[in-house]
Amino acid sequence: MTVIEFFRTVCEDIHSTVVATVDKNNLPVTCVIDIMDYDSDGLYFLTARGKNFYDRLKAHGYLSLTGMKGSDTMHSVSASIFGYVREIGTERLKTLLQKKSVYV
């Protein structure tokens, strides 16, 4: 499986993932986020200034995520990724919001 195929699986087949970050005391914190898009540079998701999740990402710059899809352990697929996070601004915002409307 190529990296782009892996990203496609996470985005399109799994979509909702559990993300781990650390807080200001370096204690682990998890939340569920939806992966909205992907390309050869990485995965894309939405958050906003003022949210604790956004603050943790800005403060530490790394996350770990895991997602699973399937009916049970023997009939499922899972994926785990860790890495650096960067803010991309508003350049992809319209596309991401359009994709989000499919899930709302």
Predicted feature locations:
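Extreme N-terminal tail/first-helix region
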Residues: 1-23
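Generic detection of intrinsically disordered/low-complexity segments and helix-coil linkers/edges
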Residues: 1, 38-39, 97
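Broad hydrophobic/π-residue packing in well-ordered secondary structure
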Residues: 10, 34, 43, 97-101
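Short charge-dense sequence patches
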Residues: 4-9, 44-50
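Short, structured beta-strand-loop surface elements
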Residues: 52, 56-104
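Short beta-strand segments
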Residues: 15-49, 57, 63-67, 76-81
